[in-house]
Amino acid sequence: MIYGIGVDVTDLARIQAAQEKNSGFAVKILTPTELANYQQLDGRRAVEYLSGRFSAKESYSKAFGTGLGKVALQDVEILNNELGKPILTKHPFSGQAFVSISHSETLVFTEVILEKEGPERDDR
């Protein structure tokens, strides 16, 4: 059963400006493994990666029902599987979590769906 759905749209230029203004911005958003992957990228791909991870973590917090205040950015990790598909590899939810990340020229759109076993009950 679906526990929560979260969506987010983030402006790539806003994330790029934040990273340019504060070089520690990526460190605050990304887990060590995500950061290592990010540091292998440059230019537009780096901006897309950072923006996508930020937006997906925002979507996750919405699906979880808490917002970013209760779920730290470091509590959620999104890596790519062998086919390049983003997957949630670390998160506080005990059920299954699914993520989708899509980019346009100027925006990133993300969606997270959380599923759990058992009767429908909103215990947030």
Curated annotation (Swiss-Prot):
Main location: cytoplasm
Keyword Lipid metabolism: yes
Record EC number: 2.7.8.7
A Gene Ontology biological process term: fatty acid biosynthetic process
InterPro entries: 4-PPantetheinyl_Trfase_dom, 4-PPantetheinyl_Trfase_dom_sf, ACPS, Ppantetheine-prot_Trfase_dom
Keyword Lipid metabolism carried by entry: yes
GO CC entries: cytoplasm
GO MF term set: holo-[acyl-carrier-protein] synthase activity; magnesium ion binding
Compartments, as annotated in UniProt: Cytoplasm
Binding positions (Mg(2+)): 8, 58
Catalysed conversion reaction: apo-[ACP] + CoA = holo-[ACP] + adenosine 3',5'-bisphosphate + H(+)
Cofactor: Mg(2+)
EC primary class: transferase
Record's keyword terms, sorted: Cytoplasm, Fatty acid biosynthesis, Fatty acid metabolism, Lipid biosynthesis, Lipid metabolism, Magnesium, Metal-binding, Transferase
Purpose: Transfers the 4'-phosphopantetheine moiety from coenzyme A to a Ser of acyl-carrier-protein.
Family, as annotated: Belongs to the P-Pant transferase superfamily. AcpS family.
Protein name, as recorded: Holo-[acyl-carrier-protein] synthase
